[in-house]
Regions:
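Conserved N-terminal architectural modules of multi-subunit, DNA-dependent RNA polymerase core subunits
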Residues: 1-540, 546-749
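Conserved tryptophan-centered aromatic signature that marks the ligand-binding surface of SH3
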Residues: 540-541, 830
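HINT superfamily self-processing domains
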Residues: 546-549, 553-562, 566-567, 578, ...
């Protein structure tokens, strides 16, 4: 029962009971509603959603990105008129997928079900087709002034097969839900979310990557001799499916007499470019304007040291003062080699290549030149602040800065790569057909590409074999990109039912598992609630392979256009001609997916408005909205790969859920989806937050934390955990009492590091110096026998337990924790329960420490060496034999024998045993 404050009174009928301090069923009612009727879909939801988004959206966008393909032959080029006599334009459209089929040897075609694919070692895959529109432009005449256009369409051209994820939208099992499981051969409790490749079940592990469109500042002085600080960003636009373009802004380690100059490293440019040269290439010419774009307010007293640090860059770039000179300088380092063209054309093409880099490769997530200019200034500003320790360097291991690439994204990257190869091969083949094709005998231009030569031009095996190989081997790496993506696809673990579900929720960091870096393996505080803290392998994969918590959701791509429309009334765009750098300073910047759009004069109103739209479901409920008041930024993200999790909303120190809602949940009147938006209630009950939103929230672990026990309480909680157990993954959540130690762990007591341990060789060694593999003499607490044991584990660590110093009458001192057990006359007793001067403890007969004092009062000799010799002389023993016994007794520390010898009690027992009946 939770105590919720109503009208300043505590209602003790809700989710938490203070008197008993125990949860009852209500938190589980909410969790049960999450899984109810959808428990299988929920557990592999991230896999299915990602794949469905790939086949329904990403794959179509990727194909459209290549339109149109322009093909010309150099043999048809007229250098006088600078035209081609024949041009071919090819566009792809109407992408379609078909049900998986089996083509039998007798010519029969039938529907393929997953079970048959398993049994017959088939690949469960769907055929893909596209329509190809071909446009020929034919120019004739002396000056090629006459042009004729011929259009042709080739329909349903096969481009390969795409492996199908079980239970996805295009899976047969999903389309034929009414068919009984006995007919399909499937288990009704199978969650899906995996592939069948050559009869083997394969699941794809989510791959961690650095979040795109975010600026990261690092100190690289230790590992780099050229630069001391760097700010880096990987940019991708919202509207296109392209590979990220990385831009680095770096501070040189070399002092040019005026300080350390700043350089920019751009894609497809061989050498780093001075910062001010890049600004001038973008149209900002004077040094003062450039400094204003970086610092915004150059007269601010806090910016004096930052302004001085730019002096080296000003001097470094004073040779190139115009936009034309700056672009020409950048062009000289462009990775472009003119082929089969004169010098003048080559220079022109190389200049166009550079302009394309500035337009499309430099910050492609920025939509206008103005946004690029301000973003370059923002990036430099962040770098300078980090260098002078005004802000902290970024944390590579924080989950705020990470994204998870799921099956859909990984397959789309492969598909884009192989479709690009298919298009390149197509261009080469069409060129050959134009130059040497059979159409030349009849000048039938329409038949340059026809159904006869089409499958030589478009090779369907390119995409099919590429995707199949990646899923079969687990190697998702792309050759020309040095990406470490081995072991991405794995054979599904079928050891137990729950292990197969857990395998589908696994996440891996694409790094060398044998590497000795510690930070990537540690449990980062930002992954609380998103990744299971317990479920990770032992050995070299520890911390590299992780598992999602059981309520974690991974976002997929969603349209960001509505976000741009919603924030427009609240912001002043950077393109506004009246906006100056001084106006931007001290105003709140507004970012959407890393793109700096403008500033807001009323940021709180914008923040609250966006939050309300999220609660109402007007914008995507998985959208991240953060007001960073320290950096004066509002950051809005709806990109794919963010980890999100549900938490209960708290408003005015009240959880927005009551008994009526709980009753409706239990009765089935309300389902989980009703709790996510305010369509069914005045307020949404549950909010999905990502690690960045979580870092700006105050989340109560239990509802009782929210109760206002005193009017002086200053904590203002924003959210509350549904239940603390939701931090665990599927496997760890099945462990009973996970907050308790396992029983063997409770028996691990501690001794002081200086305590001596007896080795099997008779040598005594400090316990701190014991190594794994050493053989020690151990004592079994039940059989009461000693044995030689090999050390397998060794721990040295601080303890919070009480530490006791035990001194015995014999002079032995032992330092041990309160729970360390000793053998006493009444059995095994912990140190804390020993009673001084009363309890008798058993210690190994060999002294580990010399006797320091005599607790018996007067020290007296019981048997001296002379007494021993004289006694045996009287018995007529030979002197040689007597001296042999003397030597042995001395070795045993029994001669001379004093009344404080710790072996007297043993001698007494032996003596009593001899004299007894």
């Amino acid at each position: 029962m939770v105590n919720i404050i109503k009208n300043n009174k505590i209602d003790k009928s809700n989710m938490y009971n203070i008197e008993t301090e125990q949860y009852i069923e209500e938190p589980w009612s909410i969790i049960e509603s999450y899984f109810k009727g959808h428990h299988l879909e929920r557990l592999v939801r991230h896999q299915l959603e990602s794949y469905n988004n790939f086949v329904g959206y990403q794959i179509i966008k990727t194909i459209e990105m290549f339109n149109p393909v322009h093909i010309v032959s150099e043999n048809d080029y007229d250098p006088v008129n600078k035209k081609h006599s024949l041009e071919v334009f090819i566009t792809f459209e109407n992408f379609q997928m078909y049900r998986p089929q089996i083509h039998e040897n007798n010519g029969a075609i039938k529907l393929m079900f997953p079970q048959e694919a398993r049994l017959r070692n088939f690949t469960y895959a769907s055929a893909m087709t596209i329509d190809i529109n071909i446009k020929y432009i034919i120019r004739t005449g002396v000056n090629l002034e006459n042009s004729q256009t011929i259009c042709k369409t080739l329909s349903k051209i096969h481009i390969g097969k795409l492996p199908i994820m079980l239970k996805s939208n295009i899976c047969v099992l999903n389309q034929y839900k009414y068919v009984e499981h006995t007919h399909t051969g499937e288990c009704k409790y199978d969650a899906g979310g995996y592939f069948i490749i050559n009869g083997s079940e394969k699941t794809v592990l989510g791959q961690e990557r650095t979040a795109e469109n975010r600026v990261y500042c690092f100190n690289v002085a230790k590992n780099n001799t050229k630069y001391i600080w760097t700010a880096e960003i990987k940019s991708v636009p919202d509207t296109k499916c392209i590979s990220p373009k990385q831009t680095n802004v770096m501070i040189s380690s070399k002092n040019n007499g005026f300080g350390n100059a700043i350089y920019v490293q751009m894609p497809r440019i061989k050498q780093v470019i001075p910062l001010f040269v890049v600004f001038r290439a973008l149209g900002v010419l004077t040094d003062k304007e450039i400094c204003e774009k970086i610092l915004l307010d150059i007269n601010h007293p806090h910016h004096k040291i930052l302004l001085q640090s730019l002096q080296a860059s000003v001097i470094d770039s004073n040779i190139y003062l115009t936009q034309e000179e700056s672009i020409k300088y950048i062009t000289s380092f462009a990775m472009y080699t003119p082929i089969n063209m004169d010098r003048e054309t080559g220079i022109k093409k190389k200049l166009e290549f550079t302009m394309d880099i500035l337009k499309n490769d430099l910050f492609p997530h920025c939509q206008t030149i103005t946004q690029k200019i301000y973003f370059l200034g923002y990036m430099t500003n962040r770098l300078l602040h980090a260098r002078f320790e005004l802000i902290k360097p970024d944390d590579r291991d924080s989950y705020i800065n990470k994204r998870i690439d799921l099956t859909g994204t990984l397959l789309n990257n492969l598909f884009r790569n192989y479709f690009n190869k298919l298009v390149k091969d197509m261009e080469k083949q069409v060129n050959r057909e134009i130059n040497n094709g059979s159409w030349k005998s009849t000048d039938d231009y329409e038949n340059i590409i026809n159904l006869t030569n089409l499958y030589k031009i478009i090779k369907s095996t390119t995409i099919e074999n590429g995707l199949k190989r990646a899923l079969a081997t687990g190697d998702f790496g792309i050759k020309h990109i040095n990406s470490n993506k081995v072991g991405v696809a794995q054979v599904l673990n079928r050891l137990t039912y729950i292990s197969s579900l857990s395998h589908a929720r696994r996440v891996s960091t694409p790094t060398d598992k044998s590497g000795k870096l510690i930070p990537p393996r540690k449990l980062h505080n930002t992954c609380w609630g998103y990744l299971c803290p317990a479920e990770t392998p032992e050995g070299q994969s520890v911390g590299i392979v992780k598992n999602l918590s059981y309520m974690t959701h991974v976002t997929i791509h969603s349209n960001s256009q509505p976000l741009y429309e919603y924030i427009t009334p609240y912001i002043i765009k950077l393109e506004n001609p009246e906006l100056t750098s001084i106006n931007i300073f001290n105003k709140v910047k507004v970012f959407i997916n890393g793109t700096w759009l403008g500033i807001s004069e009323d940021p709180y109103e914008l923040f609250i408005s966006l939050k309300e739209k999220k609660y109402k479901g007007i914008i995507n409920i998985y959208t991240s909205i953060v007001f960073d008041y320290k950096m004066k930024e509002i950051r809005i993200c709806n990109d794919s790969g963010r980890l999100t999790r549900p938490v209960l909303r708290v408003k005015n120190k009240n959880i927005l859920i009551d008994n009526d809602m709980i009753s409706k949940i239990n009765s089935g009147e309300i389902i989980w989806d009703n709790l996510l938006t305010s369509t069914s209630f005045p307020e949404s009950i549950i909010e999905y937050i990502d690690p960045e939103e979580q870092s700006w929230s105050l989340i109560a672990t239990k509802p009782k934390d929210i109760i206002n026990y005193s009017s002086e309480q200053i904590l203002k909680y924003t959210h509350c955990e549904i239940h603390p157990s939701s931090i665990f993954g599927i496997l760890a959540s099945c462990i009973p009492f996970p907050e308790h130690n396992q029983s063997p762990r409770n028996t691990y007591q501690c001794l002081d590091i200086n305590e001596l341990v007896l080795l099997s060789s008779g040598e005594k060694k400090r316990i701190a110096d014991i190594n794994i593999g050493d053989e020690v003499i151990s004592f079994h607490p039940e059989t009461m026998e000693t044995s030689i044991t090999k050390v397998t584990h060794h721990y040295i660590r601080e303890t919070i337990k009480k530490i006791y110093n035990i001194k015995t009458i014999s002079g032995r001192e032992i330092i041990a924790t309160e729970d360390h057990k000793f053998m006493t006359s009444s059995g095994w007793v912990e140190v804390k329960d020993l009673i001084p001067t009363i309890t008798k403890i058993g210690i190994y007969m060999n002294n580990c420490y010399p006797i320091k004092n005599n607790s018996f009062g007067t020290l007296s000799c019981i048997l001296s060496e002379d007494q021993f010799i004289n006694f045996f002389k009287e018995q007529n023993f030979k002197m040689k034999l007597i001296m042999k016994y003397v030597s042995e007794l001395k070795n045993q520390e029994l001669l001379p024998l004093y009344n404080n010898n710790n072996k007297i009690s043993i001698l007494s027992r032996i003596f009593g045993f001899i004299l007894s009946d």
